Amino acid sequence: MISVNDFRTGLTIAVDNGLWQVLDFQHVKPGKGAAFVRSKLRNLRTGSVQEKTFRAGEKVEKAHIENRRMQYLYASGESHVFMDNGTYEQIELGEKQIERELKFLKENMEVSIMTYQGEVLGVELPNTVELQVTETEPGIKGDTASNVTKPATLETGLVVQVPIFINEGETLIINTGEGKYVSRA
C-alpha cells in the first residue's frame, strides 16, 4: 500500500478493479476543508484517461509491473509476435492492444513488454526509433524560410513533418512519445 501523498508520475496503482498509471497529480489544500490529491490516470488495459480525486493520506495498492525485454518478430494477420530474448518464448499481441505502438515497430526491434501477474498489458517503446523515409516531396533549393516543413511517410506508414532538406531513403530519428522528427540518424 502506498499513500496518495507519495504519488509521482509513472507510478502504477491498482484502484477500482483496474490498473492505472499516474500521468499527472496535484496536491490541493483549499482554505476551507480537507486537503486532497487530484490525479490524471491512464488505464493500462484500455488506454483510457480518467481524472480521479483522492483524500489526502488515503492508501492505494501499488501494482508491481514487470518489464520483459523482447524482440518484435513479425505480424501474423491481426496479431503480432514477440520473442523473449532469454527464454525464446513467443507471445502474440492483438492489433488493438498495441495500436499506437505499431506506427513505430520494425521487425527485430527490441522493446519492453509490460506484464502484471502474468497478464500482458502492452508494449513500452524506446524513447526514440530510427525509421527510413519511403515517400516525401523533393526539397527545393533556396526555399529556406524559417522552420519550413513537409510531410514524409516512413517505412512503418507513420507520417511526420520533417524539414525540407530531408529526402527519400534517409534514416531519421523519431521521438516515440510525441511521434515527431528529432534529427537525421
From Swiss-Prot:
User: So which residues are the signal peptide here?
Assistant: none
Task: Tell me which GO cellular component terms the UniProt record holds.
Answer: cytoplasm
Location in the cell reads: Cytoplasm
**Predominant localisation class:** cytoplasm
What GO terms describe the biological role, i.e. biological process, of this protein? peptide biosynthetic process
Question: InterPro entries, from UniProt?
Answer: Elong-fact-P_C, NA-bd_OB-fold, Rib_uL2_dom2, Transl_elong_fac_P/YeiP, Transl_elong_KOW-like, Transl_elong_P/YeiP_cen, Transl_elong_P/YeiP_CS, Transl_elongation_fac_P
Pathway assigned in UniProt: Protein biosynthesis; polypeptide chain elongation
Q: What Pfam families would the database entry show?
A: EFP, EFP_N, Elong-fact-P_C
Keyword presence, GTP-binding = no
SUPFAM superfamilies for this protein: Nucleic acid-binding proteins (SSF50249), Translation proteins SH3-like domain (SSF50104)
Give this protein's Gene Ontology molecular function annotations. translation elongation factor activity
Q: Which UniProt keywords apply?
A: Cytoplasm, Elongation factor, Protein biosynthesis
| Family label | Belongs to the elongation factor P family.
NCBIfam families hit by this protein? efp (TIGR00038), PRK00529.1 (NF001810)
Question: What PANTHER family does the database record attribute to this sequence?
Answer: ELONGATION FACTOR P, ELONGATION FACTOR P (EF-P) FAMILY PROTEIN
Q: What does this protein do?
A: Involved in peptide bond synthesis. Stimulates efficient translation and peptide-bond synthesis on native or reconstituted 70S ribosomes in vitro. Probably functions indirectly by altering the affinity of the ribosome for aminoacyl-tRNA, thus increasing their reactivity as acceptors for peptidyl transferase.
Report the protein name in the record: Elongation factor P
- Which organism is this entry from? Bacillus cereus (strain AH187)
